[in-house]
From Swiss-Prot:
Family that this chain belongs to: Belongs to the ThiI family.
Protein role: Catalyzes the ATP-dependent transfer of a sulfur to tRNA to produce 4-thiouridine in position 8 of tRNAs, which functions as a near-UV photosensor. Also catalyzes the transfer of sulfur to the sulfur carrier protein ThiS, forming ThiS-thiocarboxylate. This is a step in the synthesis of thiazole, in the thiamine biosynthesis pathway. The sulfur is donated as persulfide by IscS.
Name the UniProt record assigns to this protein: Probable tRNA sulfurtransferase
Keyword Nucleotide-binding attached: yes
Protein's organism: Streptococcus sanguinis (strain SK36)
GO cellular component: cytosol
Amino acid sequence: MQYSEIMVRYGELSTKGKNRMRFINKLKRNIQAVLSVYPKVHVKADRDRTHVYLHGTDYQPVAESLKQIFGIQNFSPSYKIEKSVPALIEAVQSIMKEVYQEGMTFKITSKRSDHSFELDSRELNQTLGDAVFEAIPNVQVKMKAPDIELRVEIREEAAYISYETIRGAGGLPVGTSGKGMLMLSGGIDSPVAGYLALKRGVDIEAVHFASPPYTSPGALKKAQDLTRKLTKFGGNIQFIEVPFTEIQEEIKAKAPEAYLMTLTRRFMMRITDRIREERSAQVIINGESLGQVASQTIESMQAINAVTNTPVIRPVVTMDKLEIIDIAEKIDTFQISIQPFEDCCTIFAPDRPKTNPKIKNAEKYETYLDVEGLVERAVAGIMITEITPQAETDEVDELIEGLL
């Protein structure tokens, strides 16, 4: 038998009261976006669960995609069966013979939305249980935590049987907790920060600073590929490329070396905040981890944050590097992050950056620069690309080969 649909059950949505259907409809749209690569798949949502109809599509890749989508507690692949007692008996016996192993226990759980069906739920449980005993005489019933639970659902159009329950990603549907701008460098930390923000329902747009010719096309493609990895958790993501060459050259030429990193990050924060305002987002998200590098001390964060009143979320701020790497490997961004392309944070990095920069000193050195003009030109020059789960081309391997 071939699976006909996947029944999706909700996670934290059960606590959302009057907003429940808003959350469910957003989850439905996210599932549709992620599964858009499967044209035959159809998604239908109701208050208790979402149904993913396969229409002949291979179950396995669809299930792998569903495992990544936030807002799903668990899901079960189901067989569509003719709505008759003989057909249900035959299907139950066939499934049990396939999955049963010596010593396993079982349970039948029936549910009817079609109350005109010839048997009620109790009678159906008894009839199908007897059919299992007929097929496997030595099998034992266990009402709590059986090894195999056959779930039978009688609907208007057909009957459905499932026995597997696969854990989902949990969390909240992406887009139900507002919108944030993710400062995406190309390193290990910022994609993990983006993933954790997505898990709590924040819709993200990725802001990447590029400084050609100092940064290569490979660095840009790397950031786009990292963004693409994040799309599997909630659908398409807008990728915003910011031209940053002029700003970095100006800082390098006119500011003390010890403050290069502080001033660079203050400009990044200003520009991201300006883009956030124009694109109606509420927060900024970055991958700063306390004490990991010189620019990520509390004093540095304070000096950089001083240019904005917008909340800055730092999901990995208390994690050590190994914890962050564990998540990066889990979400399949680690191998991309370690590709040998420098980003704009490393090309002009001073040998001895200031670890306790003073806000008044940063403000003083910025008087040497046309801060407003530089920010305005950078924002005016942004390029926006919609990143989808499917890459149009994959040039990274070629770019790496060119470096070797």
